[in-house]
Amino acid sequence: MGDEEKRNRAITARRQHLKSVMLQIAATELEKEESRREAEKQNYLAEHCPPLHIPGSMSEVQELCKQLHAKIDAAEEEKYDMEVRVQKTSKELEDMNQKLFDLRGKFKRPPLRRVRMSADAMLKALLGSKHKVCMDLRANLKQVKKEDTEKERDLRDVGDWRKNIEEKSGMEGRKKMFESES
């Protein structure tokens, strides 16, 4: 067993040594990578950013600041215009995709919620914001005059039989019945 223990210790020591060597190599590689990135950054800045010439007088510095602000404003306007264009095209794409699904018969079904909505609002939601449709559902209905016909009177009279029975029920009703017969 003594021989085997020595051998196991030697193997463990060798593993530890190899690990430490690998860690040292990795550390040097990381340092090289960091220095390479820093050099690339410096080269990019030197290439794309012109060196800043600071003039001697205060008015020249202010003029330089105004020029830089004008460039910033122009870049911001361009950025805003691009964002608006992107939003507009994405909205058009969504509308076209919805029309495509409608034409194919495959609807993307959103999760449904109960919403009280008028017919106009529903059509606006279905057709999109570009289409203006006004729909008055009551306009197509014909007007009906209420006529008091004989049939309706008969139906009302038939409805009154309950009242008659309620009046005749109980002692007072029977008393009235006898009084009316005599």
From Swiss-Prot:
Keywords: Acetylation, Actin-binding, Disease variant, Muscle protein, Phosphoprotein. One of its GO terms (molecular function) is troponin T binding. Residues 97-117 are annotated as: Involved in binding TNC and actin. The modification N-acetylglycine is found at residue 2. One of its GO terms (cellular component) is nucleus. Residues 2-48 are annotated as: Involved in binding TNC. One of its GO terms (biological process) is positive regulation of DNA-templated transcription. The modification Phosphothreonine is found at residue 12. Troponin I is the inhibitory subunit of troponin, the thin filament regulatory complex which confers calcium-sensitivity to striated muscle actomyosin ATPase activity. Belongs to the troponin I family. This is Troponin I, fast skeletal muscle. It comes from Homo sapiens.
